[in-house]
């Protein structure tokens, strides 16, 4: 069972690419260890909005570790301390009670800051439009009847698929 942690959160705030930026500091209390990093930022934003303050702006899309939109620098490391994981797949159990967690945007001339930790990713669109990506020919999918599956295995697979119908 995960325990709750309390920590100091320092987030980068900036109103645009030419604006001066600064860190704002927040004390986060009793955050469950099974909370994802982005969910923790959602909790911060709920607190900011309830207090009449502007929410912290950050990018995200799928929240399933696929798209990479959630890219942040956390404590000076891309995506934080978890090796090979995107920010949305980083859980608060990776941190300790009393930690200071610093959140910053990607810093690159190619990706100017729009606001806080949201960056302009149109440079990626230009690369894709120019054909600057890798594709792999994987062949065609096998015929559905090429691999025989027992009725028991098919029933079990269907039960599992039905169970995760919520998308969790």
Could you say what each language-model-derived stretch is?
Residues 1-165:
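Signature of N-terminal electron-transfer/Fe-S-associated modules in redox systems
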């Amino acid at each position: 069972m995960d325990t709750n942690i309390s920590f100091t959160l320092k987030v980068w705030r900036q109103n645009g690419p030419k604006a001066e930026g600064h860190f704002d500091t927040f004390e986060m209390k009793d955050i469950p260890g099974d909370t994802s990093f982005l969910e923790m930022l959602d909790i911060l934003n709920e607190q900011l909005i309830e207090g009449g303050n502007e929410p912290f702006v950050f990018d995200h899309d799928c929240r399933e570790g696929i798209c990479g939109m959630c890219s942040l620098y956390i404590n000076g490391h891309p995506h934080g301390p978890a090796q090979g994981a995107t920010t949305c797949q980083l859980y608060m159990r990776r941190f300790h009670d009393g930690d200071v967690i610093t959140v910053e945007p990607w810093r690159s001339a190619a990706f100017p800051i729009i606001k806080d930790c949201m960056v302009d990713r149109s440079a990626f669109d230009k690369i894709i439009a120019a054909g600057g990506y890798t594709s792999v020919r994987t062949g065609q999918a096998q015929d559905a009847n090429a691999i025989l599956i027992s009725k028991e295995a098919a029933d079990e697979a269907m039960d599992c698929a039905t169970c995760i119908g919520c998308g969790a």
